[in-house]
Each structure stands twice: as structure tokens, then as C-alpha cells.
């Protein structure tokens, strides 16, 4: 089947340049949390929930803006909830990202006002291939667009009046998890007219993925109208979020045609005013999903970053903290935000609070931290090890439970994820921030001659022929080695300087063999190396 990708590959360099300027103007990396859908539907709820978000260590709260409550009568706007959110956030010294629950929320038009929902002739619905009308307004209807555009523009104007310097509201999400369900594309009369006009089937084929590409382009063009209007009213970063195409589903089984990684060129072509496409990550494979949205510089984009990673929704769980550290370390993420953090248990939010406390210190220590070389580590029971070669320093990074000393490592327990942000400060000089990881450091020649030995719980090699022992055993060692000069637990003080807390040596470094942070501990380690032979 023909693919229309070549048509979309060469996008205007200026689009990425302007987006980069807007994103670089954000006050800091976003240590966020998204509120549950109904958390701010009254001023009493807002007054209660926002201080709790501050106490959890967030610097930014992602808050729904509900069309049905903002325009209950057509043409009559009520900004009470918006105003209260801005006022309380300002009082709590929090930033806000408003989520426009307009025509679409999780594909459906459930947050459209009653007057919109009931007038299906004026505001037509999308239809499946079998002609079944969906509770999804059709993006091919100009009436739908104009109603949505009018309300969103009114919201942007009001935000500009209340917060003209962007002291509180720093970014806007347009719609929420756009996508067609049950069919790969809309088959309503208006959609069919556009489909025939494009001669899409003739040019690109008729399978589900060709249909999805058609739908993605039209969803993006729809969003562009809102983004362009917003940009003219109050210029700030704008993004759209996506429900992932996971679990082997086909378009329509997952929300088809949303801002998915495999459709990014269609979305960039149709909605050039959008700064970010953002993944909502709930399924397994966190690292893989994140990597699809961290799109580095490419020659065809004029050397500009194609898409910065921002995760506006992720399952709030006991692994959230190490996932945040991974996202910032590996991909220099713009931000991270667990979903429904207001409803999460203390066990689930604890990891977020502790990880964010470490990240605040790191960003305070070196505001331009992403000018340094950084890595993200994230391990579980299946994915236990990563080897990094940093210009002659080979770092073997592993899950803490690869050491035999904790009984949970071998008693059949499910391992919690371990993860960290690893930062090169200079030659033989590193910071490690995280939980549940162990890192050793070797020269390349030392690593090549390494003898793999299983350790007993006393830290010494098991007796006899250890499984996996290198065939190089008995050969004379040659070359230089790296040793730990010091491993210090530190914190960053109010002046942005490293402050010594304690030395990790002896048993805490396995007599100089590695740096480690136990599962359940959250630490910032300053590691210095030296070379010897």
C-alpha cells in the first residue's frame, strides 16, 4: 500500500524553532501531577485539593477546564472554577496547566454542554463503518469546530486577563486523548465527502492504517484552528496528548488517529502550531513508550528537536518516582505527571514526593543540568542491567536486588522497579540520584577481562566453578583499572552547592567495589573515581 509519508517529512524549520523558544521559556522542568477528572468541579474541591498537591512536592498541577460547566448556556460563560484555580495556585506558589475538556475527552464528547449534545442536527456525530452514530462529535463539522473554538478562545482571553504574565498558567492542553473508536475513521456523511474529495483510497489504500492516517490529518487540522486562535490571544506552549496504541490492538480498538508516534508527521503537518505531542503511559514498557516521544535532532528538521518528551499522564504507583528520574535523566524530559494523584494512596505518592525532592535539588544545583551528559536508569525483574560506556568509563548499572544481600532478591518477591538519574559532572566525577540501583565503574580493558562470579550473601565469590565464569580466568591481567576515590551522600543547599552528609565506604560500597542505593532509600550520591595500574 502507498504511504503518504514523503509528503509530510520536510516540515518548516521555523515551526520547531518557535516551539523551542516557547518551551525554553517555561520556568523549570515540570514536577507535575494531574488531578482526577472530577477533582475541581466546585470551589470547595479546589480549595481542598491544591494545598495537598503543594505538600506532595509538586511544582505544577494539571487541572481540567470543563466546557460543560464553563458554558452551560450557549454564549454565557462562567469562569468561577478557572478563577478559583488560578487564585489558589498563586497562593500555594504552584503553576497550572489547564486541560481543555472541550469537544473530546478520551475520544468521547462527554464534556460538551447539554445544548451541544442535544442538537445532533447542528452538531453531528461521527459514525462507524456500519453507520452507527457515536457519542463523538465529528471533526468534519464546521458547526462543531466553531462552537469549540468560541469557547476555547473565551477561555484563553480570560486566562490572559487573570494571569497576563503567565505567572500561574504556563501551558495548555487542547482536548484530551483525541481518537476515533470502533472504526479507524469517521464514516459520517461529512467525513465521507472529505474522504472522496481527497481521493484517499485511490492514493493510499483502504486498510485500517490508511484510514487512520486520513483521520489523523483531519483531527490535526481541527486542533490547528484552536491552537492558532490561542496563539494569537495568549502565546504560551500548547500540546495534545495521546492514548497509546497498546496490547496489539488495531485502529479503532485503540483511539485511532490521535497524536501517536507513528502519526507524528501527519500531526505536525496538520497542526504546526502545536508544540508537543505527549504520551499518556499506563501500559507496561514505560521505557519504550517514552523513547517514541523523545525525538532528537534530525537533519531533515534543520537540526531542531522534533518532539520534547512530556508525560502528562502516567499510572500513579509505587514505581512512579523512579520512572520520573528515568524520564528526566534519559530523555531530558520537559516534565512528568502521574494521573489522579489526588486519589492515590500514600504508598503510591511517597515515591513521587521523594523523587521530586531529589530532582529539585539537582535542578537547583545546576539549572542548566541538561547541558551535562545525563542518563536514566530503570530496572525491574526482567530488565536488570545496563552497561554505559562514557568515553573510557564503563559503568555497569543494575537493579539493587542483583546483589544477594536482601532476602527479597531471592525469595520470590516481585521486585519494585529501581531507577536513577546519572549525571556526569566532569572526568571521573558523577552524581547518582535515585533508589534501588547499584553501579560499578571500570576501564574498557578492565571490563573486557572481567570475570563474572556469583557472590554469596557474605559478599565473597561462591566456592568452586561459578556459572558464567569467564574463560579468560588464569590469564595475566593487563591495563589500567578504575577505583572509587570517594562516594559521598550529599544534598544541595539553599545556595545551590553540594553539602556533604556522610561517606559511603566499607560495607556501604562493598569495600570500594560499587556505589549503591538500596530499595526503599532515596539518595543523592557524589561519586569520584581514580585510575590505577
Where are these regions (language model features)?
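Aromatic-lined substrate-binding rim segments of carbohydrate-active enzymes
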Residues: 46-121, 219-235
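C-terminal beta-sandwich/jelly-roll accessory domains of carbohydrate-active enzymes
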Residues: 407-414, 431-533
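N-terminal carbohydrate-binding accessory modules
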Residues: 19-59
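The substrate-binding groove and active-site-proximal loops of carbohydrate-active enzymes
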Residues: 31-42, 64-82, 130-150, 162, ...
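Aromatic- and carboxylate-lined catalytic core of secreted/periplasmic carbohydrate-active enzymes
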Residues: 322-448, 458-459, 468
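Polysaccharide-binding and catalytic clefts of secreted carbohydrate-active enzymes
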Residues: 122-264
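Short, basic, low-complexity termini and linkers enriched in Ser/Thr/Gly/Pro
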Residues: 10-15, 19, 367-369
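Catalytic-core region of carbohydrate-active enzymes that cleave or remodel glycosidic bonds
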Residues: 225-235, 262-373
Amino acid at each position: 500500500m502507498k504511504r503518504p509519508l514523503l509528503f509530510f517529512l520536510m516540515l518548516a524549520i521555523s515551526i520547531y524553532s518557535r516551539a523551542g523558544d516557547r518551551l525554553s521559556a517555561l520556568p523549570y522542568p515540570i514536577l507535575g501531577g494531574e488531578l482526577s477528572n472530577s477533582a475541581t468541579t466546585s470551589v470547595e474541591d479546589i480549595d481542598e485539593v491544591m494545598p495537598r498537591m503543594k505538600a506532595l512536592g509538586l511544582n505544577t498541577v494539571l487541572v481540567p477546564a470543563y466546557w460543560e460547566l464553563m458554558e452551560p448556556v450557549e454564549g454565557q460563560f462562567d469562569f468561577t472554577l478557572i478563577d478559583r484555580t488560578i487564585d489558589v495556585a498563586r497562593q500555594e506558589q504552584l503553576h497550572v496547566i489547564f486541560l481543555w475538556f472541550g469537544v473530546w475527552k478520551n475520544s468521547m464528547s462527554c464534556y460538551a454542554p447539554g445544548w451541544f449534545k442535544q442538537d445532533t442536527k447542528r452538531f453531528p456525530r461521527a459514525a462507524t463503518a456500519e453507520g452507527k452514530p457515536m457519542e463523538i462529535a465529528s471533526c468534519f463539522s464546521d458547526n462543531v469546530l466553531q462552537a469549540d473554538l468560541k469557547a476555547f478562545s473565551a477561555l484563553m482571553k480570560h486566562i490572559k486577563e487573570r494571569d497576563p504574565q503567565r505567572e500561574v498558567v504556563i501551558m495548555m492542553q487542547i482536548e484530551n486523548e483525541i481518537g476515533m473508536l470502533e472504526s479507524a475513521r469517521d464514516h459520517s456523511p461529512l467525513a465521507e465527502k472529505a474522504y472522496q474529495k481527497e481521493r484517499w483510497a485511490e492514493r493510499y489504500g483502504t486498510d485500517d492504517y490508511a484510514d487512520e492516517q486520513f483521520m489523523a490529518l483531519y483531527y490535526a487540522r481541527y486542533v490547528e484552528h484552536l491552537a492558532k486562535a490561542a496563539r494569537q490571544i495568549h502565546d504560551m506552549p500548547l500540546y495534545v496528548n495521546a492514548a497509546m496504541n497498546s496490547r496489539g490492538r488495531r485502529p479503532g480498538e485503540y483511539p485511532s488517529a490521535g497524536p501517536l508516534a507513528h502519526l507524528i508527521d501527519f500531526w505536525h503537518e496538520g497542526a504546526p502550531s502545536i508544540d508537543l505531542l505527549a504520551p499518556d503511559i499506563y501500559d507496561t514498557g514505560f521505557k519504550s513508550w517514552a523513547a517514541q516521544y523523545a525525538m532528537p535532532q534530525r537533519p531533515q528538521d534543520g537540526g531542531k528537536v522534533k518532539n520534547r518528551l512530556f508525560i502528562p499522564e502516567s499510572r500513579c504507583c509505587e514505581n512512579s518516582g523512579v520512572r520520573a528520574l528515568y524520564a528526566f535523566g534519559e530523555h531530558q524530559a520537559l516534565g512528568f505527571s502521574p494521573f489522579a494523584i489526588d486519589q492515590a494512596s500514600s504508598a503510591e505518592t511517597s515515591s513521587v514526593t521523594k523523587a521530586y525532592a531529589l530532582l529539585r535539588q539537582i535542578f537547583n544545583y545546576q539549572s542548566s543540568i541538561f547541558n551535562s551528559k545525563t542518563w536514566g536508569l530503570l530496572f525491574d525483574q526482567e530488565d536488570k542491567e545496563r552497561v554505559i560506556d562514557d568515553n573510557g568509563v564503563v559503568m555497569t548499572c543494575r537493579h539493587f536486588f542483583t546483589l544477594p544481600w536482601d532476602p527479597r532478591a531471592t525469595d520470590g518477591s516481585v521486585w519494585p522497579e529501581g531507577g536513577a538519574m546519572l549525571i556526569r559532572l566532569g572526568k571521573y566525577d558523577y552524581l547518582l540520584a535515585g533508589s534501588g540501583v547499584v553501579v560499578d565503574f571500570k576501564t574498557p580493558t578492565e571490563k573486557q577481562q572481567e570475570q563474572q562470579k556469583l557472590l554469596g550473601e557474605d559478599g565473597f565469590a561462591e566456592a568452586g566453578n561459578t556459572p558464567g565464569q569467564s574463560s579468560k580466568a588464569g590469564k595475566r591481567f593487563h591495563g589500567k583499572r578504575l577505583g572509587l576515590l570517594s562516594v559521598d551522600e550529599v544534598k544541595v543547599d539553599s545556595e545551590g552547592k553540594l553539602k556533604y552528609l556522610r561517606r559511603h565506604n566499607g560495607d556501604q560500597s562493598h569495600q570500594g567495589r560499587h556505589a549503591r542505593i538500596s530499595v526503599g532509600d532515596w539518595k543523592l550520591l557524589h561519586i569520584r573515581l581514580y585510575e590505577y595500574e
